[in-house]
Design a protein with these regions (language model features):
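Catalytic-core environment of secreted peptidases
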Residues: 47, 55, 59-91, 222
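His/Asp/Glu-rich mid-to-C-terminal helical/loop segments that flank catalytic regions of hydrolases
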Residues: 206, 222, 226-251, 296-301, ...
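Zn-dependent metallopeptidase/amidohydrolase metal-coordination segment
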Residues: 6, 12, 16-19, 75-76, ...
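A short beta-alpha structural unit
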Residues: 28-29, 260-269, 281-283, 287-288, ...
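Midchain, well-structured core segments that form catalytic/ion-binding scaffolds
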Residues: 125-126, 132-134, 138-290
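A non-catalytic alpha/beta surface segment that caps or lines the substrate-entry region
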Residues: 18-64, 349
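N-terminal capping segment at the start of a domain
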Residues: 1-30, 124, 322, 377
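Alpha-helical metal-binding/catalytic segments enriched in His/Glu/Asp
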Residues: 74, 83-127, 210-216, 222, ...
């Protein structure tokens, strides 16, 4: 394993779509995403591996040592948030590429093929910054989302996933590999590892997540000529909903629930017109599904009262509901053993953020690893992780992948999902006015 070669590749990729303050902007299926994909494809070809692109744009570099055997897949994603960080996702893909190359050399030198083959993946649209929902490519691969429905999803400009992928030349037709297991390494995007001085986080579970699609419908009118008493301002109502989403966390123990509104659009978006429509997306997350259920119920009640107060209509729909997923105990034990052999400190940790590994954990034994994030900052240009921590994580991923291709987690059962009782299967809700 060459740390210098890995770091050279990582810092090169960070120049693609680079932003002024050391971040990147490589939203899914944009020109800069295409440039990064081209780099990945060329790297895979130079390594002598098979390149496949499936029907949702996922890219695979396959190393087949044992014909007919399934594949352990390792990787992450190369797309980013708008004005995002250069470490999120890209680190996991590039680390996987170099881990796979090291194992490939070991296999060639030993002349002994392992039980399983190995593949490196760049998942499509993990971030969800351009197309919703996030974690799209891996969820389609895992059968959690319908491919045709996802290809029809459009961005804010009305461009569909199908059109965008076709436009950059990455609407593939190949099938992904048969899966034996999955591993992913990622920056923590939190402060626990840095604060405790721990090298590696062993992810044991994901938080429960759900989003609310909220449409506020008021009445368009003149900002100067319309009397204040006669206004039905959708933006004023939406601003109060944003505060409700923020403040609902105060109803629960500190940090038991996180919530925010991260996207907002309004119509007609003119400086001299009272807004007739505002669309926003609220994000609720907790380690306890029932807390999300309670927060959702409280918000719906408050939104209903607000709609009546302002004499407007508010439509609220549930979407992107993700249950708690627990990672296999055997994978956690395996990872702790690898860390110990490498002389690395480790601890179990939850992931509050969504990752491709959470989707993959529904179809195959999966391992999720974290390395420290400086100040816990992520999804912004200030995101940072040291070179030393990245190289340490590369060694860890290589060790785990080596064990997985040898069959370490073969025969492990898939974990079950933990849904909130009141939200599971919910189709949506309506609030206020004539709704």
């Amino acid at each position: 394993m060459s740390a210098a070669a890995f770091l050279n590749d990582f810092h090169h990729v960070a120049t693609i779509g680079a932003t002024p303050n050391n971040g990147v902007d490589r939203q899914a299926a944009t020109a800069d995403d295409a440039r990064t994909r081209n780099w990945f494809a060329e790297w895979v070809r130079r390594a002598g591996w098979e390149l496949r692109v499936d029907g949702i744009g996922n890219m695979f570099g396959l190393l087949e040592w044992t014909p007919g055997a399934p594949f352990v897949v390792i990787g992450s994603h190369l797309d980013s948030q708008p004005l995002g960080g250069r470490f999120d996702g890209a680190y996991g893909v590039i680390a996987a590429m170099h881990a796979a190359r090291s194992i490939d050399l070991e296999v060639a030198e030993s002349g002994m093929a392992p039980r399983f083959n190995l593949a490196v993946v760049n998942w499509f649209n993990e971030e969800g910054g351009r197309f919703a929902p996030s974690i799209m490519g891996s969820s389609v691969f895992a059968g959690l989302l319908d491919r045709e429905k996802m290809l029809a999803v459009t961005d804010l400009q009305g461009v569909s996933v199908r059109e965008a992928l076709d436009g950059i030349g990455y609407l593939g037709t190949a099938e992904g590999p048969e899966l034996a297991g999955y591993a992913e390494i990622h920056i923590e995007q939190g402060r626990i590892l840095e604060r405790e001085g721990i090298n590696i986080g062993l992810v044991d579970s994901s938080w429960y997540t759900q989003k609310l699609d909220i449409e506020v419908l008021g009445e368009q009118s003149h900002t100067g000529a319309t009397a204040m008493a006669d206004r039905h301002d959708a933006l004023v109502a939406a601003s109060k909903i944003i505060l409700m989403v923020h403040d609902v966390t105060k109803d629960f123990a500190e940090e038991a629930l996180v919530s925010s509104v991260g996207q907002l659009t309004l119509e007609p978006n003119s400086p001299i017109v009272v807004a007739r429509r505002v669309h926003l997306v609220a994000d609720l997350r907790s380690g306890d599904p029932e807390i999300v259920t309670a927060a959702r119920a409280a918000l719906l009640e408050q939104i209903d009262a607000l709609a009546r107060e302002h004499d407007i209509k508010v439509n609220v729909k549930d979407f992107d509901i993700r249950p708690i997923r627990r990672f296999p105990k055997a994978g956690l034990e395996l990872s702790a053993k690898v860390a110990g052999k490498l002389g690395l400190s480790s601890r179990r940790i939850q992931t509050m953020a969504g990752h491709d590994s959470v989707a993959m954990n529904t179809v195959a034994p999966s391992v999720m690893l974290f390395i420290p994030s400086v100040d816990g900052v992520s999804h912004c240009e200030r995101e940072f992780t040291t070179d030393d921590d990245m190289v340490t994580g590369l060694a860890m991923l290589t060790g785990v992948a080596r064990e997985l291709v040898s069959g370490a987690l073969a025969g492990q059962e898939r974990p079950t999902a933990e849904l909130a009782t009141a939200v599971a299967g919910a189709a949506g809700a309506m609030a206020g006015g004539a709704a």
